[in-house]
Amino acid sequence: VVDPAPDRRWTATYAAWADELPGWLAPSAVAATVERPMAWGTRAHRIDRPYVVLDTERLRESLDIAGAEVVADRARELTAKTVTLTDGRILDGRRVIDVRGITRSPAFAEQTAYGLVLDESRCQGLEPLFMDWRADNGAPADAPRSFLYAVPLGGGQTLLEETCLAGRPALDGAALRDRLHHRLRSRGIELAGDERVERVRFPVGGGRPGRFTFGAAGGFGHPATGYSVAASLTAADAVAAGETVWPASARAVHRLRAAGLRALLALPPTDLPVFSTRFSLCRPPRSALTF
C-alpha cells in the first residue's frame, strides 16, 4: 500500500444508503442512521430508505490491512505490475491498482460544499434533510442552485452543509458559506463563529472503469451525485481477488449515469428542484441513477 501520509486522520463526512453497504462493515463504523430522510424539492417528501452516516475514524480503523506492507511515499509512475515512487524506488507486484482519485481539471464538473458542525441542541426544529432546495439562502432566483444537507454525526452533533450538487465551474466556498449563513439565520439558527468547518471540493467526472483502477479513479463515483464510498466498499473484496467488477451491464449503467450528469449540468437553475423531486420519488429498482 503506497500512501504519502498513511497515518493521517480522515476528516470528511461519509454517508450512504444502508442497503448499499457491504454486510461485513463493522457496526461501530456507523455513527447515525436516519430511517426516512426528508427531501425538499418543489415540495416535502420522505424517502423510504434508511440513510447511514459513517464514523470516519472507526471506519478507517475497521479496514484491516494487516499483512500488507505500507510505504509512505507517492506513486510517480504506474504499470500493470510496477510502481515507481518519487524517491526512485520501484515496487513490483502481481497487479497494481490505481486508487489515487481524480486530478482536478476545468474539463470535469465538481461538487462543492461548505458546512458547519453544531450541537444538536442548537438545531431544534430542524430534522435531517437529504436535499433541501428551498430558496431561503439569499441567492438570486437565476443564480446556480445549491441545497442544504443536514445530517446527524452522532455524539450530539449535526452537520449543516450548503452544497452545489455539480457545476462546471462549481460554486466556490465563499458563496456557499454566505448562502449557508443566510439560510440558517432565516430559520432561526444563530452561529457563534467558532463552529467546526467542513469544506468539500472534488470532481464528479473523469473516473475510468477498468481492471487496474479503483474508487473514484476507477469510475466508482456516481457522476451525477458524487457518492462513491458504498460502491467502493462493496467491490473491494472482488477487486482484491482479481475478479471482474465491470461487466457490460455495469459499464452501460456507468454511461447512463454520465449522461445524467450532462443533463444535470444543462438544466436551468429553476428546474433543479423539479428534477430532484421527481428523481427522489423513484424507487431504487426503477432508477439506474440511484443516489
Regions found by a protein language model. Give the residues of each.
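N-terminal FAD cofactor-binding segment of flavoenzymes
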Residues: 1-43, 58, 114, 118
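A short, flexible beta-alpha/helix-coil linker loop
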Residues: 44-46, 165-167, 219-221
